[in-house]
Structure formats: structure tokens, C-alpha cells
């Protein structure tokens, strides 16, 4: 049974301020929890149905600081979801230092004011799929540890580093170092004909406003995904997470041609 004080603590982690103060975040779902346990992520609390706990290998439970058998009603009270899963865990945030030297060595992603949790989670998932290790977010992007981001990333936060920083300073430094900065813009060149490198920065903007005016001068390569459909209404753009997946895929395809 989950005590009332423990319930209140777990529920409080749905708030960004508390997550930042405690350096903890929530994950939910049988598959997600098992994946984090298998990856030996630092689990502070595991609250789960007894049958779920019994299904876990002993080695997966040994690294958990506190294991709490929970009823369905317990999980329903502490879950951020309408329908709770069999397991929920509180995870310690990693302490990863931002190393901008990586911008010279590999392909990185920069996100300007992406505010929808589902979009950020999907972008992280796509980045992990295509081998992109680092994402740099503006400080007004949605929090990577928002429960909805974690859910939509499907555990990909394990494999991708997400940093929050001043994008103008970051891009100014990259521009001065002659690092190519690919900005996704409506007036860009088709990504299918534009020459793409194995390294550089992919810059993606806000869902409705696009890339901020102050960042436009640092773009070295304007790219876009051409519309193939002849439909004249109803489809005027791709959302940022869909666009990100297409762009990541094309960079990977281009890289394959260069190997």
C-alpha cells in the first residue's frame, strides 16, 4: 500500500518546479518501467501491482531504493494518466554536462520554443532511432521531464541528452566556428536535393511561429520538405515532430551515400 505522504510526493512530481528541486521525474507503464530497470537507471521509487513486481528478475529490483506494492486504486490516485498502468517509477535525473565540442563532430538538433509535450517526446524518439545523441532546447521549450514528454518518447530519453540553453549564444558560437546550421524554413531548398553533411546542426522552430527572428541570421543552409500532394486545402504543413522525422531520415540516407 502506498502511504498518503508518499502519494502526495509522487503526485507533486507532476509539477516542473518540484521536479527541478528534487532532481526526480516520473515514468509510467509496464514496458517503460522494465526498460528503465534493464538499463540500470537510478530508480528512487518503484510502485507497482504485486503481480508486476513478481514478474521482474531479482537483479532488476536490487538497484531500486524503495519498492512499494500498490493496488489499482493506489496507482489510479498517483498516475498522471486517465487509465493507470501496473507500474510507476520515480527516476533520478542524470547529471550530464553540456559539451558543445560535439557540435563539430556529429549531427545535433536545436529546438526553438517547441511547446507541445507530444512533439518533443516524438522528436526525442526519432533522434534516438536515427542515432542523434544531443538535443539543445531553448529555455522556453516544454520540459523534457514532463510526464507527457516521457510517455511519447517511449523511453528514448535514456539514449538522448537534452539540454536547455541560450540558443542565440549557442548558434552564434557555432556560426563563428563555421559549423553548418540547417534551418527548416518554408522558403528553403528541398531537402531531397540539398547537399547534406554528416555533421552540423538541424534547427527546428515553434509549432506555429517557426524559428525566431533573432536566430535566422545564423542559418547557413535553408531547407524544407516539399509538398508532393496536389491538395490545395487542409494540408498546408507538417507538424514539427513529423518534419523532424523526415529530416533526420534524409540526413541518415545522405550519410549512407557518403560512406
Regions found by a protein language model. Name each.
Residues 1-53, 141-142:
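Boundary-proximal intrinsically disordered activation/regulatory segments immediately upstream
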Residues 29, 115-123, 235-243:
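Amphipathic alpha-helical repeat scaffolds
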Residues 38, 96, 100-187:
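RNA substrate-binding interface of SAM-dependent RNA methyltransferases
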Residues 67-92:
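Glycine/small-residue-rich loop that forms an oxyanion/phosphate-binding "nest" at active or ligand-binding sites
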Residues 70-71, 112, 138-139, 161, ...:
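Short beta->alpha connector loops at strand-helix junctions that form conserved
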Residues 129-130, 144, 149-155, 217-259:
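Structured adenosyl-cofactor binding patch, chiefly the S-adenosyl-L-methionine
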Residues 183-236:
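Active-site/ligand-binding-proximal alpha/beta "capping" segment
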Amino acid at each position: 500500500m502506498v502511504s498518503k505522504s508518499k502519494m502526495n510526493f509522487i503526485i507533486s512530481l507532476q509539477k516542473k518546479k518540484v521536479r527541478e528541486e528534487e532532481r526526480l521525474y516520473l515514468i509510467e507503464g509496464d514496458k517503460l518501467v522494465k526498460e528503465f530497470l534493464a538499463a540500470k537507471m537510478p530508480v528512487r521509487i518503484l510502485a507497482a501491482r504485486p503481480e508486476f513486481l513478481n514478474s521482474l528478475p531479482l537483479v532488476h529490483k536490487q538497484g531500486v531504493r524503495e519498492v512499494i506494492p500498490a493496488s489499482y486504486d493506489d496507482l489510479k490516485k498517483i498516475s498522471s494518466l486517465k487509465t493507470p498502468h501496473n507500474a510507476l517509477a520515480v527516476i533520478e535525473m542524470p547529471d550530464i554536462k553540456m559539451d558543445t565540442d560535439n557540435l563539430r563532430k556529429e549531427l545535433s538538433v536545436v529546438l526553438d520554443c517547441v511547446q507541445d509535450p507530444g512533439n518533443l517526446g516524438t522528436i526525442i524518439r526519432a533522434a534516438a532511432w536515427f542515432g542523434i545523441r544531443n538535443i539543445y532546447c531553448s529555455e522556453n521549450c516544454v520540459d523534457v521531464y514532463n510526464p507527457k514528454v516521457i510517455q511519447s518518447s517511449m523511453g528514448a530519453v535514456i539514449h538522448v541528452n537534452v539540454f536547455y540553453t541560450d540558443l542565440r549564444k549557442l548558434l552564434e558560437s557555432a556560426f563563428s566556428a563555421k559549423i553548418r546550421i540547417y534551418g527548416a524554413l518554408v522558403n528553403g531548398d528541398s531537402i531531397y536535393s540539398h547537399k547534406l553533411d554528416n555533421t552540423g546542426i538541424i534547427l527546428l522552430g515553434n509549432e506555429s511561429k517557426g524559428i525566431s527572428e533573432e536566430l535566422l541570421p545564423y542559418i547557413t543552409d535553408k531547407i524544407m520538405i516539399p509538398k508532393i500532394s496536389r491538395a490545395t486545402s487542409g494540408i498546408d504543413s507538417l507538424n514539427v515532430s513529423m518534419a523532424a522525422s523526415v529530416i533526420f531520415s534524409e540526413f541518415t540516407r545522405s550519410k549512407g551515400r557518403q560512406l
